[in-house]
Amino acid sequence: MIIRSPEPEVKILVDRDPIKTSFEEWARPGHFSRTIAKGPDTTTWIWNLHADAHDFDSHTSDLEEISRKVFSAHFGQLSIIFLWLSGMYFHGARFSNYEAWLSDPTHIGPSAQVVWPIVGQEILNGDVGGGFRGIQITSGFFQLWRASGITSELQLYCTAIGALVFAALMLFAGWFHYHKAAPKLAWFQDVESMLNHHLAGLLGLGSLSWAGHQVHVSLPINQFLNAGVDPKEIPLPHEFILNRDLLAQLYPSFAEGATPFFTLNWSKYSEFLTFRGGLDPVTGGLWLTDIAHHHLAIAILFLVAGHMYRTNWGIGHGIKDILEAHKGPFTGQGHKGLYEILTTSWHAQLSLNLAMLGSLTIVVAHHMYAMPPYPYLATDYGTQLSLFTHHMWIGGFLIVGAAAHAAIFMVRDYDPTTRYNDLLDRVLRHRDAIISHLNWVCIFLGFHSFGLYIHNDTMSALGRPQDMFSDTAIQLQPVFAQWIQNTHALAPRATAPGATASTSLTWGGDDLVAVGGKVALLPIPLGTADFLVHHIHAFTIHVTVLILLKGVLFARSSRLIPDKANLGFRFPCDGPGRGGTCQVSAWDHVFLGLFWMYNAISVVIFHFSWKMQSDVWGTISDQGVVTHITGGNFAQSSITINGWLRDFLWAQASQVIQSYGSSLSAYGLFFLGAHFVWAFSLMFLFSGRGYWQELIESIVWAHNKLKVAPATQPRALSIIQGRAVGVTHYLLGGIATTWAFFLARIIAVG
C-alpha cells in the first residue's frame, strides 16, 4: 500500500494590477528593448523592430512574464479570428446569393463577393446561376451553413454581430489578464488542471453542445431542405428547440423524451443517431445523423478523459508520474525530466503541439474529399480542390514550425548539465547514426523514384511503350495500398456488421454517388502511376525531415562548430576567419526546410488535382456512363516527367492563360503577378550582402550631392534578413501561382 502525502490545496493564482496600462509606452516603437527604443540610426532598425517585437524571450528572461505575454497574445489572436469569421458571415449576409443557392445548390454556384464596376471591372462578376452575377467562392462556407441549419441571410447577420461581440470580449480578456489579473507561473504550469479543463470543457462540452445543436436544429432543418421544402416555410431554430412536438413529427422517438436514455433503451434513438457509413445520395455528403452520433460519442470520450488527472482531490493520474514510469529495457532513464522541460520551455511545448496539429491538418485535408462532411460539398469541385490545397499548405507550414521551435528550445532552453541518459539525451548522442541513415534513405528514394520516371521518359521517347513501367506493360501495382482499400471496402459486412456502407466510397466496391448528374464520389483505382508518384512523395517528405531534424539535433553543437549554442538560434556564419561555416544555424535549417516543404506539398496537390479530374470528378449520363473531366488520362500520362509537363501543367494551364476578357481574368492577372513575386525572390536568394551595400553607397553619394540624404543611414539587408525576404516571396509567389492555376482551371471545367 502506497501512502501519499496530503495533496496541497490549489489556490486561485493571479497577481492584481501587475503592469499599468500606458498608451505612451505603447506608442513608443521598440519599448520592449533598450537598444531598439533609442530609435533608428540605420535602416536595419526597422527590421530588428519586426524581428524582436514578438520574440518575448529577448524582452525578459522571467518565465512568468513571458508566459503572461504569450497568454495575452492568444486572446489577441482569438479576437482576430472572431473578426475574420464575422467578416465571412457578414459577406454571406450582405453580398451573397446564399438563399438562392440554398433553393437550388446543384445549378447555382456559391458567390459572396460582387466587384464594383470601376472602368470595366464588372467583367469579373461571372454568372453563377439563378441570375446572380458575382465571384464564385470556394471556401465551403455555404455548405457549412446549410449543414448547421442556417436558412436565411438574417441569421447570418445575427451570427456576424455575435462574432464581433466575441472579438471585443477577447480583446478585453487579453488586456485584463495582462494588466489587471495576470496569472502566476504556477497557474501556467498546473498541467493536470489544464488537461481536465481542455479535455472536458473545450473538447467534451464543445462536442456535446455541437451534437445537441445538430440533433435539435441541423437535422430537422436539413431533413426539410432535402425534401425540397422552401427555406422560408421551415420553422426557425428556436421553434424546434422549444417545441418538442415539432421534432416528434420527424423523429417519433422524441415524444418519449429522456426515458429511453435512463432506461438504457438507447436503440430508440437510432432514428437520429445512426451508424450508416457512406454518403447521403441526396446531398453527396456524409449522413448528418452519422455526424451527430459521432460528436455525441466523441463528447463522451473527452468528458471521461477530462476526469482522469489528479487535481484538488487525491485521485487520478499525475503527468510527471506517468512520464517518469515510461521507460523500457533499452531506453535508459526514459522520459525522466521531460515534465520539467515541458513546463519550463514553451518552445518545447509549442513544437510538439505544432507537429501534432500539422499532421492533423493534413489528415483533415484527406478526409474532406474521402468523407465530404457537408451537403453538396462533394459536387463543388472548386471548393473540394481549394479545401485540400489549403489544408495541405497549412499542415506543411505547421510542421516546419514544429522543427523551428524544437531548435529554438534546443538553443535557448535545453540544459545539458541536468539531462543524462534520458530519451532526448540518447537521441542526441546517436544523432550521427540517425542523420547519416536518413541521408542514405533520401538518396535511395530520390534516385529510385526519379529513376523510374527517367526510364519511362527514355522508353517513351524511343518509341518502346512495351518496356515502360505502366498498367499495360511492366506493372508496378501498389499491392499494399490495394489490400488496405479492399479490407475497408469489405468491412461493413465483416468487422463492422452494424454499418451499411464503408467509411468512404473511395475504398472500393461498386457504389457511386452522383448528385444532379455530377459525380460526388466513387471508388478510386490505384495503379502503377500512383505507385510512382507515391515514391516521389516519400522522397520529398524524407528530405524535408532530414533538413529539419538535422537542424534540431545539431542546433547546439556539431563537429564543425562545437560551440554553436553560444552563437544563438540564427547567425550567418561562425565569424570572420572561419570559412565554410555559413548556413549552419538552426534558423538556416528552417529556411532550407521551407523550400523542401514547398516541393513536397506541390507534388501532393498536383497529384490530387490531376487524379481527381482524371478518375473521380465528371458527369454521369442517364444510362449511368461516367465521363471524367480529363477522361482517365492520369494512369498513362503521369508515368513520365514529360506527361506531367504536357498533360497536366501545360494542358490545364490553358484556362488561366486564356482567361483575359472573361470573368476569370483576375486569375490570369494573379498568375502573372505571382510569377513576378516568385521571380523577385530570386534576387534576394542569389545575391550577397556586399553587392547591395556597394550599390547603396553609390546611391547615398548621389543623394549627398543633391543635399537630399536622409538622417537614417541606409544599410543593405543582413544575410539572414535577405534570406527571410527571399523565402517569403518564393513561397508567396509559388503558392499564389498555384492558386490561380488551380482555380481558373477548375471553375472553368468543374
UniProtKB/Swiss-Prot annotation:
Belongs to the PsaA/PsaB family. Keywords: 4Fe-4S, Chlorophyll, Chloroplast, Chromophore, Electron transport, Iron, Iron-sulfur, Magnesium, Membrane, Metal-binding, Oxidoreductase, Photosynthesis, Photosystem I, Plastid, Thylakoid, Transmembrane, Transmembrane helix, Transport. Its EC number is 1.97.1.12. The keyword Metal-binding applies. One of its GO terms (molecular function) is electron transfer activity. It catalyses: reduced [plastocyanin] + hnu + oxidized [2Fe-2S]-[ferredoxin] = oxidized [plastocyanin] + reduced [2Fe-2S]-[ferredoxin]. This is Photosystem I P700 chlorophyll a apoprotein A1. Phylloquinone binds at W692. The PsaA/B heterodimer binds the P700 chlorophyll special pair and subsequent electron acceptors. PSI consists of a core antenna complex that captures photons, and an electron transfer chain that converts photonic excitation into a charge separation. The eukaryotic PSI reaction center is composed of at least 11 subunits. The chain crosses the membrane at residues 70-93, 156-179, 195-219, 291-309, 346-369, 385-411, 433-455, 531-549, 589-610, 664-686, 724-744. Chlorophyll a' binds at H675. PsaA and PsaB bind P700, the primary electron donor of photosystem I (PSI), as well as the electron acceptors A0, A1 and FX. PSI is a plastocyanin-ferredoxin oxidoreductase, converting photonic excitation into a charge separation, which transfers an electron from the donor P700 chlorophyll pair to the spectroscopically characterized acceptors A0, A1, FX, FA and FB in turn. Oxidized P700 is reduced on the lumenal side of the thylakoid membrane by plastocyanin. One of its GO terms (cellular component) is chloroplast thylakoid membrane. It is found in: Plastid, Chloroplast thylakoid membrane. GO terms for biological process: photosynthesis. PROSITE patterns: PHOTOSYSTEM_I_PSAAB. P700 is a chlorophyll a/chlorophyll a' dimer, A0 is one or more chlorophyll a, A1 is one or both phylloquinones and FX is a shared 4Fe-4S iron-sulfur center. [4Fe-4S] cluster binds at C573, C582. It is a multi-pass membrane protein. Chlorophyll a binds at M683, Y691.
